[in-house]
Amino acid sequence: MEGEGSRVVALYDGNGAITETKKSPFSVKVGLAQMLRGGVIMDVVNADQARIAEEAGACAVMALERVPADIRAQGGVARMSDPQLIKEIKRAVTIPVMAKARIGHFVEAQILEAIGIDYVDESEVLTLADDANHINKHNFRIPFVCGCRNLGEALRRIREGAAMIRTKGEAGTGNIIEAVRHVRSVMSDIRVLRNMDDDEVFTFAKSIAAPYDLVMQTKQLGRLPVVHFAAGGVATPADAALMMQLGCDGVFVGSGVFKSGDPAKRARAIVQAVTHYSDPEILAEVSCGLGEAMVGINLSDTNVERFANRSE
């Protein structure tokens, strides 16, 4: 488990560390994402839920028409949310508001930027718009969030301009197993990378199809060059604390809050669990009396669609 001091993220562009006198547009976006470090980002579908999330202590909300559990249950094509809904949620809260765009759908991202969204999540939870290309995130002023299952995928998204990385997990399932698998994969590769010499790093970068300079930066930092949040299946305070103890910088919570018996109480408990993730006594206290958790999905069922596998 990492200490708090080791969670400070250096700012990097393609040429190395950025100093105060040399601020690139990308470094500004990475800095905005760092402001969310140590926090909880909650999915909401209306202004009332957004207010509950803010009162519970969420650092940001994700504005959606349907939470991932409903996307799974209802099927169909999942697209960017109605801009009117996003505007209503923005008016209801003072914390940052995120919204999702389909992978590769740069026009959805342009619309979200035009209405003043704070962050865009290029998300595999929505139906793919382009199965070969992600959005060139350097073309936008606002920070982007992208998902990953492993280190190579994370660094490819950062090269495209992602200012925050999250584990993909399996959103809408209430099942943490895939998120744990993905964060352990990233952390394991970083531990191995730190002990490599330069020749080995070059070969390793090719093997994971990642940019060599970003692999070297990751080796030097001992972590990803941007903030790294957990997402996908976080449903309880214990789930949230687990992801923090595994080394994540914060947590996304989707269906796990507003598909539970007492959303307001569970939201507060998850925020407290992220803040006090290394204190079992506080974790035990905040886990009591939360009501029924979301039912969830057993991922051993072969009929379950894997959102995480929708893109590379």
UniProtKB/Swiss-Prot annotation:
Active-site residues, Swiss-Prot/TrEMBL: 100
Ranges in a coiled coil: none
MF terms (GO), sorted A to Z: pyridoxal 5'-phosphate synthase (glutamine hydrolysing) activity
GO BP: amino acid metabolic process; pyridoxal phosphate biosynthetic process; pyridoxine biosynthetic process
Tagged with keyword Lyase: yes
EC number: 4.3.3.6
Keyword line: Lyase, Pyridoxal phosphate, Schiff base
Superkingdom in the source lineage: Eukaryota
Reaction(s) catalysed (UniProt annotation): aldehydo-D-ribose 5-phosphate + D-glyceraldehyde 3-phosphate + L-glutamine = pyridoxal 5'-phosphate + L-glutamate + phosphate + 3 H2O + H(+)
Keyword ATP-binding: no
Induction (free text): By wounding, gibberelic acid and 1-aminocyclopropane-1-carboxylic acid (ACC), but not after treatment with methyl jasmonate or active oxygen species.
Disulfides per UniProt: none
Enzyme class: lyase
PROSITE patterns named among the record's database cross-references: PDXS_SNZ_1, PDXS_SNZ_2
Record: residues binding D-ribose 5-phosphate: 43, 172, 233, 254-255
InterPro entries: Aldolase_TIM, PdxS/SNZ, PdxS/SNZ_N, RibuloseP-bd_barrel
Binding site for D-glyceraldehyde 3-phosphate: 184
Function: Catalyzes the formation of pyridoxal 5'-phosphate from ribose 5-phosphate (RBP), glyceraldehyde 3-phosphate (G3P) and ammonia. The ammonia is provided by PDX2. Can also use ribulose 5-phosphate and dihydroxyacetone phosphate as substrates, resulting from enzyme-catalyzed isomerization of RBP and G3P, respectively. Also plays an indirect role in resistance to singlet oxygen-generating photosensitizers.
Family: Belongs to the PdxS/SNZ family.
NCBIfam families: PRK04180.1, pyridoxal 5'-phosphate synthase lyase subunit PdxS
Additional record remark: Vitamin B6 is an essential quencher of singlet oxygen in plants, that can protect cellular membranes from lipid peroxidation.
Protein name: Pyridoxal 5'-phosphate synthase subunit PDX1
Organism from which the protein derives: Phaseolus vulgaris
Gene: PDX1
